[in-house]
Amino acid sequence: MHRTTIPLIVAVLTVSVALRCMGQDTESLPAREAKAASIDELLLFFPSKFPDGEWKPKDLQFQDVFFVAEDETKLHGWYCPANAPRAVVLVAHGNAGHVASRAPWLRFLQTKAKVSVFMFDYRGYGRSEGTPTVEGALRDAKAARAKLCELAAIKDTEMLLMGESLGGAIVIQLAADSPPRGLILQSTFSSLRDVADVHYPKLSWLVPGNKLDSATQIVRYRGPLLQSHGNVDRTIPFSSGEKLFRSANEPKQFVTIEHADHNNWVTDAYLNQLDRFLARVSEAQK
């Protein structure tokens, strides 16, 4: 999750409080102003757009994939098939950047982890059209999952779901609706309200309690889980990750990444655990 999220949240929520105190309903504001007070669109999403970034990375074999969400929003992602893959993985990234900014991670998954991977951009990110919202991101993920079924010629229950930070909350919803072969979460929160309680407790009541309530949704998923979190994460508290993990069903594994903040969780120790998890899930499928 983008580090500047927190001060931005405080600023916009303060405006929201002021409007309520003055008796002005944000629903009555013009569309542009109402969006300016939208927690979903301005406080959670920090998209980067094409052509910013390196869109022709070296040593990564990928296909540009264009597809549409249920509401006809045009979306884009990179499909990176591996030779003789041991698994197929759908990846939902965090709330900043785009697929091109994750090229090194995609390269690792394809060449080292030996999995075929499809990473998509939420609406408003990269080459995907539209404006990002929570509801839209969930629709986008659902459409991406269906597209990966087509690309890899598999059922949705045969793929693994992987999510980083915000992306973890997105794939938890997918897993709750239709269980995948396995679920991999990195630096993911228990709920948006819980994060708000830590960073701005006096204003956290403005965040709906059911907004990305992953701890409640993950109860509906029954299958293998690998969850990891840096123990000095200053963006999503380590305790939030622990709370999410406690809510999950077995079989599950929690990996504490020592001395890791929110974005530097890719360590040799974690990659070793990821490799073992992929091996177990792949073997169980045979």
Predicted features along the sequence, with ranges:
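An N-terminal hydrophobic leader/cap segment in hydrolases
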Residues: 21-66
